[in-house]
């Protein structure tokens, strides 16, 4: 990858829509980030095809049988892969495993996640459907730094959209996804340019 650009590891378990959007953004040599590798817990994840299309290295980890929890030792394997790839930032983009120890210790303040709700509302799985079924008038997405809590780390960026009368849950999900792609690239760029700083729970440096 290009010298001087922030090397990003993207973690994904599924189709890799956010991964693909970020990889496309990184094709611009003027962009501050480059995707160093994909880390996935699923050897059949469609995100692997995306990585091959962009000639991005793939690391499939032996995560263990339980969805959510990683097997003992898996995080140490992840840290080793990331260090081998000279990773500076980790982006969780639909990674369906919980990071609890080694990764967060090794990359403190350098792990961010994209979540499809306006946190702190609607944490966890199927956040878009949660919001739709609750009847909110405003939905959206959040990029936040990752800590040991569930979707509870300091918020970097958020984007809000109106929920229309004719929306269904899938329509809302697709419109939120457009915003996910936009603010994830923006957050990675702000990190790469050294703009972000955390003061207690606030992330500063996000304004133009």
Over which residues does each language-model region extend?
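One-carbon transfer enzymes
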Residues: 1-208
